[in-house]
Amino acid sequence: MVPAVVHLCVVVLTCAWGCSSRENSSYKPSYRGARVIDLEDIGFDDGDTFSLRGRRIRVLGIDTPEIAHPEMGILENQPYGIAASESTMAWITRAERIEYVPGGRDRYNRRLAHVFLDGELLAIRLIRAGLAYQTVSHYGDSGFPDLAQQILDASRNAPKPQFTPPHRWKRKQRQKSGG
């Protein structure tokens, strides 16, 4: 009986080691410098911003419609803002692999990053869904010319979003609130 138990343990441990080593050795990052993110480390804010272990991350290359942020003078949700937020949350939650490639910081001290879900740029998913405007033509490529070009191409081939560009909508909201 003991040899059978020992044999079973050896088989299970060998398989477990083999499976995990295959998984690790087959991992290929979606982009140079990409870092894998664990879902439990993510908190959701809106369509283009989330937190990673408490630090705010802003998705590069896009701008999604706003959701209410009274502390910033945005008192109501922009049309499609909830849809963009919910889509981002659903896509991230369902992804088997979440990666980000950190860039610089914005004026709000958020970390700027490209985000990949199962190898696809989140920015491109949002653009194709009509839930984001590209911002590459305004802010430049942020040191990622190839990714910026992919975002521009997706934007050219996607339907135009059915909402006011968020920077214009935000300006009007702040004027209404006196801020």
Feature annotation, model-predicted:
Residues 3, 7, 15-179:
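Small beta-barrel nucleic-acid-binding modules, primarily SNase/OB-fold domains
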